[in-house]
């Protein structure tokens, strides 16, 4: 832009330079991703390659069909208009290209962009919700202790205070050991302490209702990972997020369905402004379409 200002508007080519300057001003706000580069970045050429076209540019996503087959298939079907929705008001069945025209309704800059919320879709959520497809052992959660050697709580659990620790860790442990009353605490103290020191993150998440599988691999959530949002175990619908940074504290609780292979710059642009999911924001980025291109 500074270079452009050096040109005099008295040139006969004034219109050209003004148009070029306008292009340079606007172009940083859009991102351009390349199909050839996207294909080259794929881990497996047989995986589905999706093109997400947004108001900020293109994002190419390699879906990991071998790691989350059911959830990947549902995502493709939603994108391609293969899932039926019954509208009680219209008394009719529709098969919309679900994501077309939706927005990234939740944005936490430098952390995550989230889209596909059924709360913002006139037809709501597809039924049924799908089960998680997560291999906690592949993630190493069976080897991560809840308590470190100095007695501090594993930071990936994001436990904020003693009350939360009691609710999330101690109460389910008591139930597993059959401790139901205060009077039973003292006789069971040794068992409680032993089990507490041996408690893993995987086991704690199982207390919370997560069920893990070992018949396929699972990768952790890192920058560029595409995973399904949920409101609890085995509650996977259409809503998804793209991680803008490594986020290992999310591992084991969200089913990973893909990875961005081209267009992370676009994702960063979308993530440049915080968006509150509780209210519509006309400045939020639009998903024009999501299509399989291979």
Regions found by a protein language model. Give the residues of each.
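N-terminal secretory signal peptides that target proteins for export/translocation
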Residues: 1-12
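Bacterial N-terminal signal peptides
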Residues: 15-27
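Cyclophilin-like peptidyl-prolyl cis-trans isomerases
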Residues: 30-294
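Short, low-structural-confidence N-terminal segments
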Residues: 5, 16-17, 31-33
């Amino acid at each position: 832009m500074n270079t452009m200002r050096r040109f005099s508007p008295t040139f006969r080519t004034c219109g050209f330079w003004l148009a070029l300057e306008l292009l340079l001003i606007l172009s940083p706000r859009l991102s351009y991703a390349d199909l050839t580069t996207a294909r080259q970045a794929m881990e497996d050429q047989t995986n589905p390659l999706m093109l997400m076209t947004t108001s900020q540019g293109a994002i190419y996503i390699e879906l990991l069909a071998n790691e989350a087959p059911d959830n990947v298939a549902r995502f493709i079907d939603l994108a391609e208009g293969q899932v039926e929705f019954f509208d009680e008001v219209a008394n009719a069945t529709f098969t919309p290209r679900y994501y077309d025209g939706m927005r990234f309704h939740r944005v936490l800059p430098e952390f995550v962009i989230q889209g596909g919320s059924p709360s913002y879709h006139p037809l709501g959520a597809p039924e049924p919700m799908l089960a998680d497809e997560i291999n906690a052992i592949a993630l190493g959660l069976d080897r991560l202790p809840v308590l470190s050697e100095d007695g501090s709580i594993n930071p990936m659990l994001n436990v904020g205070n003693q009350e939360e620790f009691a609710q999330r860790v101690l109460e389910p442990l008591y139930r597993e050991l059959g401790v139901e009353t205060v009077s039973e605490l003292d006789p069971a103290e040794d068992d409680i302490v032993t089990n507490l020191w041996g408690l893993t993150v995987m086991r704690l998440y199982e207390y919370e209702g997560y069920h893990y599988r070992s018949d396929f691999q699972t990768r952790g959530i890192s920058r560029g990972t595409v995973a399904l949002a949920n409101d609890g175990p085995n509650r996977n619908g259409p809503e998804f997020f793209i991680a803008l940074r490594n986020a290992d504290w999310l591992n084991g609780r969200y089913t990973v369905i893909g990875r961005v292979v081209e267009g992370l710059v676009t994702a960063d642009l979308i993530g440049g402004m915080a968006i509150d999911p509780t209210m519509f924001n006309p400045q939020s980025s639009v998903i024009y379409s999501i299509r399989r291109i291979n």
